[in-house]
UniProtKB/Swiss-Prot annotation:
Entry's Gene Ontology BP terms: rRNA base methylation; tRNA methylation
Positions of disulphide bridges: C112-C343
Known catalytic reactions: adenosine(2503) in 23S rRNA + 2 reduced [2Fe-2S]-[ferredoxin] + 2 S-adenosyl-L-methionine = 2-methyladenosine(2503) in 23S rRNA + 5'-deoxyadenosine + L-methionine + 2 oxidized [2Fe-2S]-[ferredoxin] + S-adenosyl-L-homocysteine; adenosine(37) in tRNA + 2 reduced [2Fe-2S]-[ferredoxin] + 2 S-adenosyl-L-methionine = 2-methyladenosine(37) in tRNA + 5'-deoxyadenosine + L-methionine + 2 oxidized [2Fe-2S]-[ferredoxin] + S-adenosyl-L-homocysteine
Similarity section: Belongs to the radical SAM superfamily. RlmN family.
Positions with a binding annotation for [4Fe-4S] cluster: C119, C123, C126
Source species, domain of life: Bacteria
GO MF assignments: 4 iron, 4 sulfur cluster binding; metal ion binding; rRNA (adenine(2503)-C2-)-methyltransferase activity; rRNA binding; tRNA (adenine(37)-C2)-methyltransferase activity; tRNA binding
Record: residues binding S-adenosyl-L-methionine: G169, E170, S201, S224, L225, H226, N300
Protein name: Dual-specificity RNA methyltransferase RlmN
Any matching Pfam family: Radical_SAM
Organism: Campylobacter fetus subsp. fetus (strain 82-40)
Residue ranges of every copy of the Radical SAM core domain listed in the record: 105-338
Enzyme Commission number, as recorded: 2.1.1.192
Length: 354
């Protein structure tokens, strides 16, 4: 049997007659949250029985969830082959001014999804890397994370949702399936999550950044930089030996980005590793001529890590210097730290307690 979520609407239409059935099914699955074909009451019983014999709708089983004191929720999902992945819901608040001048607070959601079971990149600061690489996720397994989390939390279809490919795995090492997931999520008959609400993060696979740009999906790009010299970056991120900083920056400069948006550079700050003012100065030079936003991330500790969280003073000084030189810079508020759901803390669980 096949995972129906792996199919774009066009692919599904090519398998069905009449073709408009594909739109009906898409709307049932993505807009009406149908979890079985039996719920699709405007489709004949014979067609539903045929669909049940060929497809399944839910490739994920939630093994457990943990809720952080900040409201973040981490989910451990089991796939059909027994492998596991983790995803995170990050609820936030945004203020919207109404016509009468009053300010209303609305929930805004970001869903952090995994693109692989494990990861090949071997970054020394990341817990996901400790378990090695197992396999790529299919497009449907990626889409299912968003669909399941939205459904579980009763997030209205029309509510604003952002998707960040920053969970387990290197998204550009699974570019075919990630790009297909982006397109499925964009479908207006599906979840209708626009490309500008989807951010793909990469450790710096320069050749794949180029391929992603050629696909012209309209997604936002985030670069996990974390160091300003090749020597240090190669120690932190072995991928730098294949694609050094210069190669990554060349790929970024060639990447098509919306005029209203910026390329995000993620910079994980670690105590006495990359947190001094000389690093900040070198970063400003490195980003010269690029419409960039720097996201400073305080290292999130995990068992067995050789790194430590930096002092708030050093982080503030780092940010202040970047801003004084005209670089847009924010300090990411790490959500889910108390449930190991923050950056670099997700991992595959080979033995799951059911």
């Amino acid at each position: 049997m096949r995972n129906l979520l792996d199919l774009s609407q066009d692919e599904l239409a090519n398998l069905l007659s009449p073709k408009f059935r594909a739109k009906q099914i898409y709307e049932w699955v993505y807009k009406k949250n149908a979890r079985s074909f039996d719920e699709m009451t405007n489709i004949s019983k014979d067609v539903r029985e045929n669909l049940k014999s060929e497809f399944y709708l839910d490739p994920l089983t939630c093994v457990r969830s943990e809720t952080s004191k900040d409201g973040s929720i981490k989910y451990l999902f089991k796939l059909t082959d027994g492998k596991t992945i983790e995803s995170v819901l990050l609820p936030m608040k945004e203020e919207i001014s109404s016509e009468d001048g009053s300010v209303e607070r609305h929930a805004r959601y970001t869903i952090c999804v995994s693109s692989q079971v494990g990861c090949k990149m071997g970054c020394s600061f990341c817990l996901t890397a400790k378990g090695g690489f197992v396999r790529n996720l299919s497009a449907g397994e990626i889409v299912a994370q968003i669909l399941w989390i939205k459904r579980e939390n009763n997030i209205p279809y029309e509510r604003r949702v952002n998707v960040v490919y920053m969970g387990m795995g290197e998204p550009l090492d699974n570019l075919t399936n990630v790009s297909k997931a982006v397109s499925i999520l964009k479908d207006n008959d599906g979840l209708a999550i626009g490309a500008r609400r989807q951010t793909i993060s990469t450790s710096g696979l320069a050749s794949q950044i180029k391929k992603l740009g050629e696909l012209d999906l309209g997604v936002l790009l985030a670069i996990s930089l974390h160091a300003v010299t090749d020597e240090l970056r190669a120690k932190l991120m072995p991928i730098n030996k294949a694609y050094n900083i210069a190669a990554v920056m060349d790929a970024v400069r060639a990447f098509p980005i919306d005029m209203r948006k910026r390329v995000m550079f993620e910079y994980l700050i670690m105590d006495k590793v990359n947190d001094n003012l000389s690093d900040a100065k070198a970063l400003v030079k490195l980003l010269h001529g690029i419409k960039a936003k720097v996201n400073l991330i305080l290292f999130n500790p995990h068992e067995g890590s050789q790194y430590q969280r930096p002092s708030i003073e050093n982080v503030d000084n780092f940010r202040t210097y970047l801003q004084s030189r005209g670089v847009t810079c924010t300090i990411r508020q790490s959500k889910g730290l108390d449930i190991s759901a923050a950056c670099g803390q997700l991992k595959e669980r080979s033995k799951v307690e059911m």
